[in-house]
Amino acid sequence: MAHARRSLIAGLGVGTALVALVVLFAPFVVRAESAPAEQRVRFTVVSARAAAGLTYIPRIGQAATPLVLYPTARSPRYEYRGAMPLRITDAVTKSVIAEATVPLEITEALLLLVPLDPAPAAGLRYQTYVLDDSAVRQAAGTLSILNLSGFALAGTVGDRATSLATGLNPPVPIARSAAVVLRTTVKNRSLQAYAGTVELRRGERALLVLLPPFYRGSAEVQSRLLIDSPGSATRP
């Protein structure tokens, strides 16, 4: 068969030979492009605002599963098997309201849903942030801060000085109880943006999510403190 294929191409012009190659191998290309890789991801969900009536499909052919969200903690753990993006839908309208593309290297994810503002009339309602939630990235006894506040923040975590970058900051070891005080500069004035205390039990870790102020013009950021034990249920 290989000799016959070479003879066919040799007897044609260069341009025709290229067309013949495309025709011969096109079915393989189409099949490769139409079959995206399946991923297996375990994940939890947190919404920056109260949300209900959300579902997702764990696997092709299965019924939609409701997502149970907590106001101050990660949701229960769910599992997804399929191609990306992972889609979250409205239970009533069945429309897709959030999408998450989880990188291949992440198998334990935290999905943070932040409502789009202003709220769109149709289409996606949330911006979705995907975080590596594995114990490898953040071990017990540490605090990570996700700065989505829109401010440049600096201050102290316990007795350690810190300056936060935008996005997810590296985890830092903390004592069982650590005060967190963060400030920002507005019009040459240093203003307190956040103050709180993180208290951990043995084997726990914390993620502090900082969001833009609720009131326009305020320097006080909104916050969500999420405490859990890696690989186990969350603590409300």
Question: For each predicted feature, which ranges?
Answer:
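Intrinsically disordered, low-complexity polar regions and short flexible loop motifs
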Residues: 32-236
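Intrinsically disordered, compositionally biased low-complexity segments in eukaryotic proteins
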Residues: 2-4
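N-terminal export leaders
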Residues: 8-9
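Bacterial N-terminal signal peptides
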Residues: 13-27
